Amino acid sequence: MPTEPSPAATDARAAVAAALRDVPHVPGAPKPDPVLIADDVRRMFGGVNAVDVDHVEVQRGAITALIGPNGAGKTTFFNLLTGFDKPNSGKWTFDGRSLGGVAAARVARAGMVRTFQLTKALNRMTVMENMRLGATAQPGENLFAALVPAVWRPREKAITEQAEELLARFKLDTKRDDFAGSLSGGQRKLLEMARALMAKPQMIMLDEPMAGVNPALTQSLLGHIQALRDDGMTVLFVEHDMHMVRHISDWVVVMTEGRIVAEGPPDSVMNNPAVIDAYLGAHHDTDLGDDALLDDAVLEQLRTEDEEAR
């Protein structure tokens, strides 16, 4: 990562902060330029409301964290929005287009892609083959077009070039011909994020991108997530590490028992009694993102990250 942010990155962060400055810190707060709007989304399992979201909006171009204790419904909500599960009720739009009830493949083609808490790399395929699978608009998938190389070869070349660029960006280019199953857990997280970008999405949804990743790769992932925002992409991610959430998020949405109970900038949310109660019970004198709770090594990493972002 560079020691100083580029002018474009600084402008992107400032623009997001300015856009969200006057947004009220309440659940379901309206945003000035929402790319995703969801209303009355419900999902029940055996009579239990796993998701019970009245209204939520995600600001275009921002990094929004979706946090909450285990079992809060975060991943289930992701599954509903991206077509991997069906709600009992509800509707949502992405960039003005209704995506309720739309299949996962069509959601991805619409510009909203996701990664998974447990990586979905195809272990017996190479890293490059995994990357190529992430691209859309592949004429070679059509039986008749596949019989005419002149139809699909130009697109295949463009896809390969795009994959090479992304692998270099994520420092996986030396692994291009390795089987995905040979990668470390952190490298598979990087591969999944890079593969998602092959679809050239407007918005990427990351489900616990830091889970099981060693500290060195954690810093790399944080940098990549911030770079997506700086390039104008919208990021919505689930994360349990409150310190990471505080240091990279523009906005935080909090779920518990399927409901959204708080929203706001990281510092505001970390001190919200409703949020602290959801995580820690009655310990309302605790700041969930208090850096004093970190060990010296991790705190130094985060301070370095902040200095580089200024």
Region locations from a protein language model:
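The feature captures the beta-strand-to-loop junction immediately N-terminal to the Walker
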Residues: I67-P69
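Helix-to-loop junction immediately C-terminal to a conserved catalytic motif
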Residues: T82
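Conserved ABC ATPase "signature" region
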Residues: L143-K175, G223-Q226
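ABC-family P-loop ATPase nucleotide-binding domain
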Residues: M1-R42, H284-R310
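A short, surface-exposed alpha-helical micro-motif characterized by mixed small hydrophobic
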Residues: V245-H247
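Catalytic Walker B motif of ABC-type/P-loop ATPase nucleotide-binding domains
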Residues: I204-E208
